[in-house]
């Protein structure tokens, strides 16, 4: 497994690391970002920060040289989802996601909405099973499959709809690469360097384990954002991944 770059011709970094920004204050988020190098990672903006600070936060990060994964997990009727995905592309994000459970028509509409953007379109991925969910959580929703089985079913639907890949747990990555092929991108949260606390994630792996499993992009949050020296932490993670590769 080697580092994979964005499909965009203007890729900033070849690191597979995506740092999750989870801040309540814009100034603190930007102060953290100013400590790290866009050559060492990409950045993920989720629902809370986007709701608080809007598209301008994404522009602020882009102006600092970072690729941005807009993690809003769109899940709505096909037309609404398509418009939202197109708006994300207009914003110039590197990656955007939808919920695979929204179904084939919704995912196909999202895919088609990106066609006018050509090579400048963001990667479009789908969320399968949230990494916080266990078998009992799925059973509560009437799903009798295990998280791995349900994730694979949704991943297959995602590929059939022509999306670029899925969000999945690292434990599913090995099989997904075998089943769906190397070109189908796997984005994995719940990645934590050895010695880090699990937090609210239930299915976790170290960066080295994730790379070996076939993960293309690994989302890492607090182990980097709460580090006393986040720039060095990122360099250490990337160095360990290069050794693993």
Curated annotation (Swiss-Prot):
Q: Which UniProt keywords apply?
A: Decarboxylase, Lyase, Pyrimidine biosynthesis
Q: SUPFAM superfamilies under this entry?
A: Ribulose-phoshate binding barrel
Its annotated pathway?
Pyrimidine metabolism; UMP biosynthesis via de novo pathway; UMP from orotate: step 2/2
Q: Which Pfam families match?
A: OMPdecase (PF00215)
Q: Which GO terms describe its cellular component?
A: cytosol
Q: What is its EC number?
A: 4.1.1.23
Q: Where does substrate bind?
A: 22, 44, 71-80, 131, 192, 201, 221-222
Catalytic center residues = 73
Listed under GO biological process in this entry are: 'de novo' pyrimidine nucleobase biosynthetic process; 'de novo' UMP biosynthetic process
Q: In the UniProt record, does the keyword Lyase occur? A: yes
List the molecular function annotations (GO) for this entry: orotidine-5'-phosphate decarboxylase activity
Catalyzed reaction equations: orotidine 5'-phosphate + H(+) = UMP + CO2
Function, please? Catalyzes the decarboxylation of orotidine 5'-monophosphate (OMP) to uridine 5'-monophosphate (UMP).
| Family affiliation | Belongs to the OMP decarboxylase family. Type 1 subfamily.
Quaternary structure, per UniProt, is: Homodimer.
- What is the protein name for this chain? Orotidine 5'-phosphate decarboxylase
Upper lineage: Bacteria, Pseudomonadati, Pseudomonadota, Gammaproteobacteria, Enterobacterales
């Amino acid at each position: 497994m080697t580092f994979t770059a964005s499909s965009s011709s203007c890729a900033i970094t070849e690191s597979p690391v995506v740092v999750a920004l989870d801040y309540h204050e814009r100034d603190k988020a930007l102060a953290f970002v100013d400590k790290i190098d866009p050559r060492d990672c990409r950045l993920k903006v989720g629902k809370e920060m986007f709701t608080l600070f809007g598209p301008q936060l994404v522009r602020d990060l882009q102006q600092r040289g970072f690729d941005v994964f807009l993690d809003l997990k769109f899940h709505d009727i096909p037309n609404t989802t398509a418009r939202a995905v197109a708006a994300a592309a207009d914003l110039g994000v590197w990656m955007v996601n939808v919920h695979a459970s929204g179904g084939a028509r919704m995912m196909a509409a999202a895919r088609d909405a990106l066609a006018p953007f050509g090579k400048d379109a963001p990667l479009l991925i789908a969320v399968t099973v949230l990494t916080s969910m266990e078998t009992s959580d799925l059973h509560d929703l009437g799903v009798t499959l295990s998280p791995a089985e349900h994730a694979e079913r949704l991943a297959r639907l995602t590929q059939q709809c022509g999306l670029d890949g899925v969000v999945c747990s690292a434990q599913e990555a090995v099989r997904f690469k075998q089943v769906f092929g190397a070109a189908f991108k796997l984005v994995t949260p719940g990645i934590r360097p050895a010695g880090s606390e699990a937090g609210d994630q239930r299915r976790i792996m170290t960066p080295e384990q994730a790379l070996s499993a076939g993960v293309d992009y690994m989302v890492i949050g607090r182990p980097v954002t709460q580090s006393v020296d986040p720039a060095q932490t990122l360099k250490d993670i990337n160095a360990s991944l290069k050794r693993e590769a």
